Amino acid sequence: MEDMAKKDGVIEIEGVVTEALPNAMFRVELTNKHIVLAHISGKMRQHYIRILPEDRVVVELSPYDLTRGRIVYRYK
């Protein structure tokens, strides 16, 4: 994700959505085999980008809580 603006202290990692949960939450298995709970970023909600199980996504993780994240990109 070279063209996206980098935020300080945020970890970006790829993963695969394994399960869709209520309230636009998703369970994502990261490339390092960890499983995190993630929600959709505001820009993705604004543009009605749909996320389905088995989609490859980019997740932003905060260094303070590595079990929760934000989905910021869905690969086509």
Curated annotation (Swiss-Prot):
Keywords: Cytoplasm, Initiation factor, Protein biosynthesis, RNA-binding, rRNA-binding. It holds the Pfam family eIF-1a. One of its GO terms (cellular component) is cytosol. InterPro entries: NA-bd_OB-fold, RNA-binding_domain_S1_IF1, TIF_IF1. The keyword DNA-binding does not apply. The keyword Ligase does not apply. It is found in: Cytoplasm. Its main location: cytoplasm. It comes from the Bacteria. Component of the 30S ribosomal translation pre-initiation complex which assembles on the 30S ribosome in the order IF-2 and IF-3, IF-1 and N-formylmethionyl-tRNA(fMet); mRNA recruitment can occur at any time during PIC assembly. Belongs to the IF-1 family. This is Translation initiation factor IF-1. The lineage of its organism: Bacteria, Bacillati, Actinomycetota, Actinomycetes, Micrococcales. The gene is infA.
